[in-house]
Structure formats: structure tokens, C-alpha cells
Amino acid sequence: RDVAPSRGLGDVYKRQLLLHGQETFLCGKESCNKGYIRHPWYGKKVGYIGDSITDPNCYGDNIKKYWDFLKEWLDITPYVYGVSGRQWNDVPRQAEQLKKEHGEEVDAIVVLMGTNDFNSSVPVGTWFTEKEEQVMAARGETKKLETRKRRVPIMTNDTYKGRINIGLSHLKKLFPDKQIVLLTPLHRSLAEFGEKNVQPDESYQNKCGEYVDAYVQGIKEAGNLWGIPVIDFNSVTGMNPMIEEQLIYFYDSGYDRLHPNTNGQERMAHTLMYQLLSLPASF
């Protein structure tokens, strides 16, 4: 699953990665001259957890993936574990494999997952159960037991939010000192892969009566609940296959308006490169 770094690839492109600020420039190279700052993710080792949009085997060499562009531009070493069709209940398995194969050498982890939970009509569910319990407390007087309502995260693979709770709990425990970044699912349109695999566009609800928006919102909420930064790929990539003119970013206007093509993956990579400027890759 390792994708070996190619030092020297994309050097010409790297020299073009200069962002003019008031007094400084962004440098996409290992060593930077005075007046330049280095991208915080330059040269880092990053694990990628996800589905077909991340999977190197999805369309093979026909699509250059976003993480491959980041390898070229920022010399990121990618450890790619995304598998086509996988849902949030596969996050623990992918995380365990990353831990086993790369342990402490990985600097950061990026998770792009959720679109298949929507397509498979996994119920959204709720984040917590609540019940009254007694707890010791004091506010300027002698401490005493008080009855208060307490919430406990729901850990179940039967719901989307339960799966996210399990997955993020697992990631936090396996990689307590590593940067973890969540990406919201992209917009989606018609995908027709055969008689037994036809996925309507996002204007339709899934079988449990939810629009894809609920699954996007779930990732945003999870960031606050678990203390994990979220990049809203659903909006900031600017890609929407429901707009005919934007199908230039998707694989095939006839049967696959779901998967970004190389142009779409490059736009994703550009977006991610700039968004990651605000986040440290390691601590």
C-alpha cells in the first residue's frame, strides 16, 4: 500500500508554488530562501483513509489521485488505504492497517469517507444516549452528590453517527499525538455501473429518507464532538456534478458523474494544499 516518494518529481511545478503575501512567499521546496515560508505539510508522511475517490485501484492509471498530486507538489509520502465502496465502518480496519505498517512514522491522517454510507442508506442516527446519574460537584459550597443528565457516545455500526463515533475513537486511541483531518463528502450525481448498481443523483433521498446533506453535516458535527479539524470539501472544492458544465471534472458524463476525473482530482489537491496551510502536520 506504500506509495514511495519521488524526490525531484514536479520540481518545475514546485517552483511555481509561490503565494505572494504582504512580506512573505510560500515555498514548496525542502529549503527556502529568506523571505519565504515552507508549506507545513512539505515532506510529511500522510495516511489516507477512504473509499473509491482515494483508492489507487479505482480506474487505475486513468485517474491521477489527489494524494498523488500532493506527493508531486509537496513531497508528501502517501500511505494510501482507501478501498472502493467502503463506508465508515471500515475506518477502524484501515486505521489498524496503517498503524501496523507505519506505526509512529506517519505524521498525519486524512479521512475522506461517507458518500457510500449515504448510498447504502445507513440510518443517520444520533450521537449520544442520555440518562440521569449522580455526580460529585461544588460551586462555592461543600461538595455533594447532584443528579444531572449525562450523555454517552453511541458506539454502533447500525447508524452513520455511531460508526463515526467508533471510527474517530479508534483513530484517536491509535494515533493520540498525530494530526487527523476530516474531509466532508463531495457532491454527487448519477452513477450507473450496471443493472445492479445504479446510484441516483443527490436531488433524491436515499432509502431511509435522507438527503446527502445529512451525511455531510454529520462530518462537520463530528469535528466539534471529537476535536478534529474538518475541511468542508463539499463546498470549498467548488465542484458540483449536478451542474452540466462542471462535468468536466468528473469521469464520464454518460455513466459516472460521481467520481472526479484527473482534472477533478487536481482541483481537489489544489484545494487541499491551500486549506492545509492553516493546520500543522505534526506536533
Task: Give names to the regions the model predicted.
Residues 73, 95-283:
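Alpha-helical cap/lid subdomain in secreted, periplasmic
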Residues 4, 53, 260:
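Glycosyltransferase donor-binding loop in the core domain
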Residues 87:
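Contiguous, function-dense segments enriched for cysteine-driven chemistry
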Residues 1-16:
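Single conserved hydrophobic/aromatic residue that forms the stacking wall/gate
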Residues 13, 17-19, 256, 262:
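Intrinsic low-complexity/disordered segments
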Residues 21-84, 92-104, 109, 244-245:
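Serine-esterase "nucleophile elbow" of acetyl-processing enzymes
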